[in-house]
Amino acid sequence: MISRTDIEPILEAIPAARQEYARHYGVHPYFTRRPANVVRAYLERFSEEGDVVLDPFGGTGVTAIEAFLLGRRAIQNDLNPFANFIARNIADTTLPSTAPLRQAFERVEQ
């Protein structure tokens, strides 16, 4: 776990690299989407493998998917059902296997 004294701010600009992530994030032009490489840089700086990342305003899941790809666990939600639909479908086609996650989610839903 990263302690408060270990946190160093990101001082350099992180240019958005939208093109290299088009395969899984170019599915739909959602209005609040953030560049995945910028989200990834923050996750790498401010979390460690195995940490839980919470994104309560998850949109189409960029933060959650990048967290999973970096070995973090993630919780994401959005008020917009369309955003959740997009996030679920991107996760289903991007992540190796979401079956255990989906089963856990369905148990929590019940």
Could you say what each language-model-derived stretch is?
Residues 1-110:
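S-adenosyl-L-methionine-dependent nucleic acid methyltransferase catalytic domains
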